């Protein structure tokens, strides 16, 4: 139990996928203008990364390794992730059409999100077990969602303030992202691996 908690803390806070590994920067900057859209994107990404971590591990262990087809690893991962994203998009279109419309092009782009592809690949290459791979994927995606929602809140607040013209828009977003990264550096000593 303690190992699971350490994995969750280290993947969500200490080794944050956005702020430490620099994966998932496109949705981090693109979907973080509104908190509602950030929450929806974060939840969808959490589901996709968690399921993709398990599914890609299973494809690797049950198909690619026994048949010596490791050269098809990335292609097979993209296909698995695309199927999961299509499932999420279909469910979201039926259940929450407003959120589906708010996420727009970023929802199908989850397929090509480097965090969604990179994390399962890192877990497979790190020889993690199925449980640890899935748990690490869940923790990393929770960290992604946390950072995305916090950053969206910061950007909403900044939109209400009087920002100098030279810093308006993207420059102040980059400065804010840097400050958020500095804040998360405080978690660096939390987990010693």
From Swiss-Prot:
GO CC annotation: plasma membrane; plasma membrane-derived chromatophore membrane
GO biological processes: electron transport chain; nitrogen fixation
InterPro entries assigned to the protein according to its UniProt record, in alphabetical order: Ion_transpt_RnfA/RsxA, NqrDE/RnfAE, NqrDE/RnfAE_oxidrdctase
Membrane topology listed for this record: Multi-pass membrane protein
Residues exposed to the Cytoplasmic side: 25-38, 92-101, 155-170
Disulphide linkage map: none
Known EC number: 7.-.-.-
Principal place of residence: membrane
Domain of life: Bacteria
Keyword field: Electron transport, Membrane, Nitrogen fixation, Translocase, Transmembrane, Transmembrane helix, Transport
Transmembrane segments: 4-24, 39-59, 71-91, 102-122, 134-154, 171-191
Pfam families: Rnf-Nqr (PF02508)
Segments in the Periplasmic topological domain: 1-3, 60-70, 123-133, 192-193
Location(s), subcellular: Cellular chromatophore membrane
Described function: Part of a membrane-bound complex that couples electron transfer with translocation of ions across the membrane. Required for nitrogen fixation. Necessary for stable existence of both RnfB and RnfC.
Similarity comment: family membership: Belongs to the NqrDE/RnfAE family.
NCBIfam families the UniProt entry points to: PRK05151.1, rnfA
Subunit structure: The complex is composed of six subunits: RnfA, RnfB, RnfC, RnfD, RnfE and RnfG.
Designated name of the protein: Ion-translocating oxidoreductase complex subunit A
Gene name of the encoded protein: rnfA
């Amino acid at each position: 139990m303690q190992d699971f908690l350490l994995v969750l803390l280290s993947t969500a806070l200490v080794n944050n996928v956005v702020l430490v590994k620099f994966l998932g920067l496109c949705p981090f900057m693109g979907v973080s203008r509104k908190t509602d859209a950030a929450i929806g994107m974060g939840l969808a990404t959490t589901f996709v990364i968690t399921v993709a971590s398990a599914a890609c591990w299973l494809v690797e262990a049950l198909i690619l390794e026994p048949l010596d087809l490791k050269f098809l690893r990335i292609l097979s991962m993209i296909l698995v992730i695309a199927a999961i994203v299509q499932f999420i998009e279909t469910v979201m279109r039926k259940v929450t059409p407003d959120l589906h419309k708010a996420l727009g092009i970023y929802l199908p782009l989850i397929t090509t999100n480097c965090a969604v592809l990179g994390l399962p690949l890192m877990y497979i290459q790190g020889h993690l077990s199925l449980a640890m791979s899935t748990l690490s994927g869940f923790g990393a995606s929770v960290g992604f969602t946390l950072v995305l929602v916090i950053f969206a809140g910061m950007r909403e607040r900044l939109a209400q303030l009087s920002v100098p013209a030279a810093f308006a828009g993207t420059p102040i977003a980059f400065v804010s992202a840097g400050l958020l990264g500095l804040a998360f550096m405080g978690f660096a000593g939390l987990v010693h691996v």
